[in-house]
C-alpha cells in the first residue's frame, strides 16, 4: 500500500516549468485536486498529510535539489515508519515520449539522479515509481540541458492533459494498488 507520494524536481522559479520538474507538477496538481497545502519539513522540503480513497497518505516535495532528494525522503519515511515499498516516487524520464506515464514496482534509477540518490540512501531498488515522459530528447541537446529546459508552447496542451493522467495514476496506485494501476496506465 502506498503511504507516501514524492514528486521530484528542483526548487526555485527558474526551474518551475522545466522538464525536470514534472514530479513537482504531478504532486502539486494532486494537492490542488485534494484541496491541501504543503507545509515546510525540516528545511528539506514540503509535505502534507491527506487522504486518497479513505487511506492516509503523505505528499512530499524535496527542496534540496534533485541530486539530494533522498535526504528528505529517507528522513520523512523513517520518522513516519514508511517502508521503501510504500513510497511512490514521481519523476521525469527522457526515454519516454512526452506525456506517457509508466509505473514500476522497482528497478534501477535509469539515469535519473534524484531516484538514484533515493535508491542509494535506502539501500534498495525496491521502490515504486511513476515515470513521466518528457522525451524524446532531440539529438542536438545534452541530456542535462534538455531536462532543465522549459516545455514549448506547442507542448502545453499535451503536458496539461498528461499531468492530469499522471495525477489519476498516482491516485490509482493508492486506491487500487500497484498491479491494477500498472495494468490501467502502462500502455
UniProtKB/Swiss-Prot annotation:
Keywords: Cytoplasm, Hydrolase, RNA-binding, tRNA-binding. Gene3D superfamilies: Peptidyl-tRNA hydrolase. Its main location: cytoplasm. Its EC number is 3.1.1.29. The record marks 92 as: Stabilizes the basic form of H active site to accept a proton. The record marks 10 as: Discriminates between blocked and unblocked aminoacyl-tRNA. TRNA binds at residues 15, 65, 67, 113. It comes from the Bacteria. GO terms for biological process: protein quality control for misfolded or incompletely synthesized proteins; rescue of stalled ribosome. GO terms for molecular function: peptidyl-tRNA hydrolase activity; tRNA binding. The keyword rRNA-binding does not apply. It is an enzyme of class 3 (hydrolase). It catalyses: an N-acyl-L-alpha-aminoacyl-tRNA + H2O = an N-acyl-L-amino acid + a tRNA + H(+). Hydrolyzes ribosome-free peptidyl-tRNAs (with 1 or more amino acids incorporated), which drop off the ribosome during protein synthesis, or as a result of ribosome stalling. Monomer. Belongs to the PTH family. This is Peptidyl-tRNA hydrolase.
Amino acid at each position: 500500500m502506498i503511504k507516501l507520494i514524492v514528486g521530484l524536481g528542483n526548487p526555485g522559479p527558474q526551474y518551475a516549468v522545466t522538464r525536470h520538474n514534472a514530479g513537482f507538477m504531478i504532486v502539486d496538481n494532486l494537492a490542488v485536486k485534494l484541496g491541501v497545502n504543503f507545509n515546510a519539513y525540516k528545511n528539506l522540503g514540503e509535505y502534507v498529510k491527506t487522504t486518497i480513497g479513505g487511506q492516509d497518505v503523505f505528499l512530499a516535495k524535496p527542496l534540496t535539489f534533485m541530486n539530494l532528494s533522498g535526504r528528505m525522503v529517507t528522513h520523512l519515511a523513517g520518522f513516519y515508519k514508511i517502508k521503501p515499498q510504500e513510497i511512490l516516487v514521481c519523476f521525469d524520464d527522457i526515454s519516454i515520449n512526452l506525456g506517457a506515464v509508466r509505473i514500476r514496482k522497482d528497478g534501477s534509477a535509469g539515469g535519473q539522479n534524484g531516484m538514484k540518490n533515493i535508491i542509494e540512501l535506502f539501500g534498495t531498488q525496491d521502490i515504486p515509481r511513476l515515470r513521466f515522459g518528457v522525451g524524446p530528447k532531440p539529438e542536438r541537446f545534452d541530456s542535462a540541458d534538455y531536462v532543465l529546459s522549459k516545455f514549448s508552447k506547442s507542448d502545453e496542451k499535451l503536458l496539461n492533459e498528461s499531468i492530469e493522467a499522471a495525477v489519476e495514476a498516482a491516485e490509482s496506485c493508492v486506491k487500487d494498488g500497484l498491479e491494477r494501476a500498472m495494468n490501467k496506465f502502462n500502455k
